[in-house]
UniProtKB/Swiss-Prot annotation:
This is Ribose-5-phosphate isomerase A. InterPro entries: NagB/RpiA_transferase-like (IPR037171), Ribose-5P_isomerase (IPR050262), Ribose5P_isomerase_typA_subgr (IPR020672), Ribose5P_isomerase_type_A (IPR004788). Keywords: Isomerase. Its EC number is 5.3.1.6. The gene is rpiA.
Length: 232
């Protein structure tokens, strides 16, 4: 079973949690896109949902495939969000934001009664940090914000390269007009402390640590999909 087949397995297992008539947050990334494709097949057969996308990219795919969409202002309270992750630990703490949509992903997840994470088994880790942590920052005062992040890292005993994410024509810009600093800290032993410290920096708009947000993780491997509950 290749990586895409595992993503499809996880997406299919998550779809079983979606009930007719739900208000649904729809994530961003390759695994979430497999979920959208499967959801669209159910919608075409008469299944009713209203979706809130977490990125313009997801919105375009939903429109293309016929998944009905609303804005979060139109549906401010959601029943369920299905989204992928770059890393998942045993407590269902997550690193997200590889696709650049972490701010909207976190807003939508926070507006949901439940969040289910879908991923292939390569994303399951004992401790977060092998994947670079995306930190969304305001373009104004970028150097000062970067220095503040470095100071936070030093206080917590973390070190590593901070790189401004690039796209084909310069700095990557999020749907909200911000930039992303990818922080390669390596192992993050205290994700809660790092989250709190990053939240205190004025130039940090949001970061990719999702803590106490996911209710379930559906992890797919060669033997199929398994469901994990938070070990908190």
């Amino acid at each position: 079973m290749d990586a895409r087949e595992m993503k499809i397995k996880a997406a299919a297992a998550a779809l079983a949690h979606v009930e007719d008539g739900m208000r649904l947050g729809i994530g961003t990334g390759s695994t979430a896109e497999e979920f959208v494709r499967l959801l669209a097949e159910k919608v075409a057969s008469g299944f009713k949902v209203e979706g809130v996308p977490t990125s313009e990219r997801t919105a375009r795919l939903c429109v293309e495939l016929g998944v009905p969409l609303k804005s979060l202002d139109e549906l401010p309270a959601l029943d369920l969000t299905i989204d992928g992750a770059d890393e998942v630990d045993p407590a269902l703490r997550l690193i997200k934001g590889g696709g650049g949509a972490l701010l909207r992903e976190k807003i939508v997840a926070a507006a949901s009664e439940r969040m289910i994470v879908i991923a292939d088994e390569s994303k399951l880790v004992d401790t977060l940090g092998a994947y670079a942590l995306p930190i969304e920052v305001n373009p104004f005062g970028l150097v000062s914000t970067r220095i503040a992040i470095e100071k936070v890292a030093a206080r917590l005993g973390l070190a590593g390269e901070l790189s401004l994410r690039q796209s084909g024509d310069g700095e990557f810009t999020t749907d909200g007009g911000h930039h992303i600093i990818d922080a390669s800290f390596g192992r993050i032993p205290d994700a809660e402390a790092l989250s709190s410290e990053l939240n205190s920096i004025p130039g940090v708009v949001e970061h990719g640590l999702f803590i106490n947000m996911a209710a379930l993780a559906i992890i797919a491997g060669p033997a199929g999909a398994r469901t994990l509950q938070a070990n908190r």
